[in-house]
């Protein structure tokens, strides 16, 4: 016969676990909102920066300009910037991006191209360092909602690697935020910058909304057509010098965007995982409660049978 006290203790344990998972789900939902607000708040700056870049680009013959960040060279070594999270309990978020990075590293090795990692997030750092992978720089313990200062620090390291020709190309491997239940690990070239592709034609922003008591994501296409500055605008400095100064800023902005998307993907994955855990806890509580009631009924029936048997014996 099942132990009633043991079942009762398990029910209480599952109840306590459900409280924790539900709290984590709500915290993740609140942080997803903050991540979305941050993406929205940085967009005006990004659009203005693109206006200036396009205007300068139209006034220069880029193939003749000395712009190190746009210069293509023979690729002998690739820097792989991998962005993961610091924590677990977020489904397959970290595992998927690490798998994507490993696959890309194998492709480069098969092509006879060297590579080295720049790792963002404790999960990536632990995984690749434990496997003695070539690592140039690591970043862990960043804010869960990324800041421009953090993106700038990482961008400075990438610029140093690229301009010193320690690497000839830098690729970004991060998770693109698609929806609360879906994320997409992607590989994107960061350096050298391609002036013809300063904007992503699939650029979108996302809004977290509540509908029918459940969280949903609304995505909105962002206009990628950038208006040029007035033709009669005069730049006091040489446009080439201005462009050389603005391109690192553009790189930092692109990196901040990737960090924000990665953070939103991680939080959404954690929210979904905790929601599933809460649902599973509810189902387990129902099963345990049913088992408890059956055990109680069996115990009562046995006691009655023993009383009746004792009475008959008299």
Curated annotation (Swiss-Prot):
The keyword Metal-binding is assigned to this record: no
Sorted UniProt keywords: ATP synthesis, CF(1), Hydrogen ion transport, Ion transport, Membrane, Thylakoid, Transport
Subcellular location: Cellular thylakoid membrane
Membrane topology note: Peripheral membrane protein
Transmembrane region(s): none
GO CC annotation, single: plasma membrane-derived thylakoid membrane
One GO molecular-function entry: ATP binding
Functional note: Produces ATP from ADP in the presence of a proton gradient across the membrane. The gamma chain is believed to be important in regulating ATPase activity and the flow of protons through the CF(0) complex.
UniProt family annotation: Belongs to the ATPase gamma chain family.
Cited NCBIfam families: ATPsyn_F1gamma, PRK05621.1-2
Subunit structure: F-type ATPases have 2 components, CF(1) - the catalytic core - and CF(0) - the membrane proton channel. CF(1) has five subunits: alpha(3), beta(3), gamma(1), delta(1), epsilon(1). CF(0) has three main subunits: a, b and c.
Record-given protein name: ATP synthase gamma chain
Natural source organism: Picosynechococcus sp. (strain ATCC 27264 / PCC 7002 / PR-6) (Agmenellum quadruplicatum)
High-level lineage: Bacteria, Bacillati, Cyanobacteriota, Cyanophyceae, Oscillatoriophycideae
């Amino acid at each position: 016969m099942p132990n009633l006290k043991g079942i009762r203790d398990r029910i209480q344990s599952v109840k306590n676990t459900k409280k924790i998972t539900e709290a984590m789900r709500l915290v993740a939902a609140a942080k997803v909102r903050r991540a979305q607000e941050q993406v929205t708040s940085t967009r005006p700056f990004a659009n203005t920066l693109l206006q200036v870049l396009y205007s300068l680009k139209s006034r220069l013959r880029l193939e003749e300009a000395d712009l190190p960040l746009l210069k293509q060279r023979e690729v002998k070594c690739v820097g792989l910037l991998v962005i993961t999270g610091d924590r677990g309990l977020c489904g397959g978020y970290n595992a998927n991006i690490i798998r994507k990075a490993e696959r890309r590293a194998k492709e480069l090795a098969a092509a006879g191209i060297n590579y080295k990692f720049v790792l963002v997030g404790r999960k990536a750092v632990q995984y690749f360092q434990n496997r003695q992978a070539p690592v140039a720089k690591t970043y862990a313990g960043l804010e869960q909602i990324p800041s421009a200062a953090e993106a700038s620090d990482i961008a400075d390291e990438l610029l140093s690697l690229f301009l010193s020709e320690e690497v000839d190309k830098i690729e970004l491997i991060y998770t693109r935020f698609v929806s609360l239940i879906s994320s997409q690990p992607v590989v994107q070239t960061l350096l050298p910058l391609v002036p013809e592709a300063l904007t992503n034609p699939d650029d979108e922003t996302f809004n977290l909304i509540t509908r029918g008591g459940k969280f949903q994501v609304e995505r909105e296409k962002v206009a990628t057509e950038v208006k040029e500055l007035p033709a009669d605008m005069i730049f006091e400095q040489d446009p080439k010098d201005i462009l050389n100064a603005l391109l690192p800023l553009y790189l930092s902005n692109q990196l901040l965007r990737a960090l924000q998307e990665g953070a939103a993907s991680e939080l959404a994955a954690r929210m979904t995982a905790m929601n599933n855990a809460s649902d599973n806890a509810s189902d387990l509580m129902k099963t345990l409660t049913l088992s408890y009631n059956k055990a109680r009924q069996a115990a009562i029936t046995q006691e009655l049978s023993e009383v009746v048997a004792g009475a008959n014996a008299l």
